[in-house]
Amino acid sequence: MSGEKKSRHVMYKKTSRDKAVSVYLGKRDYVDHVDSVEPVDGVVLVDPDLLKGKKVYVTLTCAFRYGQEDIDVIGLTFRKDLYYARTQIYPPVEDPKALTKVQERLMKKLGNNAFPFVLEFPDFLPCSVSLQPAPSDVGKACGVDFEIKAFSTNNLEDRIHKKNSVRLMIRKIQYAPDQPGPKPRAETSWQFFMSDKPLHLTASLSKEVFYHGEPITVSVSVTNKSDKTVKKISASVEQVSNVVLYSSDYYIKTVALEESNEKVPSKASYNHTFSLLPLLAYNREKREIALDGKLKHEDTNLASSTLLKEGTDRTVMGILVDYKIKVTLTVSGLLGDMTSSEVSTELPFILMHPNPDGGAKESEQEDDMVFEEFARDPLKGELQAEEKEEEEDDEK
């Protein structure tokens, strides 16, 4: 209807300090659909008078940051580029390609000195993830991040000064699959020494995919035909982060836990339902918990599960995140608590954000464009870290 108000479509903009180059993006988050990844489609606005004959390039970089700068003293750099792509934007060197809806609207708005660019993500890169530092840690967190950078130069071999460049942090993200798998279910039996019959444990979930902030219901059934007594039952959500760089390291962190002190004596059965809620709010003091990548000082959440394209090598560099429910029975021993043992089983599941409705058609909407500057006023410590890194880039 003509009387309806148009929705607002935020366009993100950032300009170099010499005012010669500005980058415009229609969004900051790019979705990895497992089989394909949304490309970065943007526009660069140049001022030919200020460029004075310089060429303009745009790069896409995926970097793994170690987070702790003092690691450099042992001869290792604390940043490794996992992927780097560069294209010349001005003067144009390629035949113009079909424009996306966002590019069409931006170029119509910005005029003749606007030039489009498209940069593709390869399908082997991890998503934006970071490991939570301890409260006392300083500097950038260990993790994977993505950056768009535009700069002007006479020669690619020359040092790139920060006044001639503009950097924009973006994210590569994934959403929950549209077709989840079967309901997770696991069972185990344990035969104790000097006990004729086993202890049987069954655990199940109502579904495979859970959304951030959604309680996870775990159904547990214990059939104790052994001569032992089950003293305690616990259910936990474990986050498993596989950090792959020069070696493969695993970090297993409990992010939610519930216990029942209900005893299950010999020859008895017991059924119980646990409700677990894995939230970052309950885990802010824990170091090395994986978090979804964030932009500047925005808040984030526990990292989403990593979905990989079939056939992808799980040793791809970066951080891969999985989740599992672990159900544990603590069983009495011959000498009481001193010799108690544990019986456990695990249920892998997926923790992600739902795919937002209408997200696929965002670029086709005829809405009002609103320009928003990429923030130059983050928290003081983060601004100092960014400026320090830019100075280091200048020195390379």
From Swiss-Prot:
It comes from the Eukaryota. One of its GO terms (biological process) is visual perception. GO terms for cellular component: membrane; photoreceptor inner segment; photoreceptor outer segment. GO terms for molecular function: G protein-coupled receptor binding. The keyword Membrane applies. Residues 375-396 are annotated as: Disordered. It is a peripheral membrane protein. Residues 387-396 have a biased composition (Acidic residues). Its main location: other. It is found in: Cell projection, Cilium, Photoreceptor outer segment; Membrane. SMART domains: Arrestin_C (SM01017). InterPro entries: Arrestin, Arrestin-like_C, Arrestin-like_N, Arrestin_C-like, Arrestin_CS, Arrestin_N, Ig_E-set. Pfam families: Arrestin_C, Arrestin_N. Residues 375-386 have a biased composition (Basic and acidic residues). Binds to photoactivated, phosphorylated RHO and terminates RHO signaling via G-proteins by competing with G-proteins for the same binding site on RHO. May play a role in preventing light-dependent degeneration of retinal photoreceptor cells. Belongs to the arrestin family. Interacts with RHO (via the phosphorylated C-terminus). PANTHER family: ARRESTIN (PTHR11792), S-ARRESTIN (PTHR11792:SF15). This is S-arrestin. It comes from Xenopus laevis.
